[in-house]
Amino acid sequence: MFIINCKNYDEISGDKIVKLAKISQKISKKYKIPIAIAPPHHLIPLITKFNVIVLAQHLDDKKIGSTTGFMIPEIVKKSKINGSLINHSEHRIPEKEIKNLIKRLKRLKLKTVLCVKNINESKKYAKLNPTFIAIEPPELIGTGRAISTEKPHLITKAVDSVKLAKNSTKLLCGAGIVSGKDVTRAKKLGSKGIL
């Protein structure tokens, strides 16, 4: 699984997200690689018609109803998303919300991509059986220095911590991934994909 988190960059604003979805669909089909796109929420409807996995960048553990401004899983699912990032380093949430969201999204049959910053979090949260755990050391995010070269031991330790949970959770890695070599190294170290 390769996840493209679009964040809120201008390069994907408006119809530019459609171009990204078309290219991702083509690459996914050609190389038989699942590709997910996590666009800003208001752009979700523009890409759900393409054959790519669509993830919300964040969802809130709030109720349906009088919750203005919150991203409610049951409501956002109707936009045809396939899952959500949870606890991204740029939008960390408390442990209780993490646990509740994973349960809630599982009930809704949505993929859960739980972001962690270290091995301790990986061990703790792997027991919740999210679809994926993505290890992203915050000090490498946005630096162009890849986890697979700067801290390869974190990937192997995270792989081991996920395996200890003895469930179906798979490990992804992120932070500073900028080249095909970074991806290849991460996969050789046991990562099942990239965020």
Regions flagged by a language model, labelled:
Residues H58, H88, V116, P137, ...:
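Short secondary-structure boundary segments
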Residues S13-K19, P39-K49, I64-E74, S89-L105, ...:
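Active-site-adjacent beta->alpha loops and helix N-cap segments on the catalytic face
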Residues K117-N129, G176-I194:
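Catalytic cores of alpha/beta
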Residues K7, N82-P94, F132-R145, L189-L195:
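Glycine-rich phosphate-binding active-site loops on the catalytic face of alpha/beta enzymes
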Residues M1-M71, T112, N120-P130:
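Conserved N-terminal beta1-alpha1 strand-loop-helix module at the mouth
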Residues K7, P40, V76, E136, ...:
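Conserved, mostly hydrophobic/aromatic
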Residues P137-L140, N167-K170, G174-I177:
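Catalytic-face loop-and-helix region of soluble metabolic enzyme cores
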